[in-house]
Amino acid sequence: MRVNITLECTSCHERTYLTSKNRRHNPDRLELNKYCPREQKVTLHRETK
């Protein structure tokens, strides 16, 4: 079952990205390197509830 999640920047805490994930294959929190428009660089983004 796929669920929609929000990704939050770890440095500025802005929630910029929406994505989906399969909970069966990825049970832990998702962490991706994405571009942060506020900081204008690539930073680590973590899944929020």
Swiss-Prot record:
The keyword Nuclease does not apply. GO terms for molecular function: structural constituent of ribosome. Keywords: Ribonucleoprotein, Ribosomal protein. One of its GO terms (cellular component) is ribonucleoprotein complex. PROSITE patterns: RIBOSOMAL_L33. GO terms for biological process: translation. The keyword RNA-binding does not apply. Gene3D superfamilies: Ribosomal protein L33. It comes from the Bacteria. HAMAP family: Ribosomal_bL33 (MF_00294). Belongs to the bacterial ribosomal protein bL33 family. This is Large ribosomal subunit protein bL33.
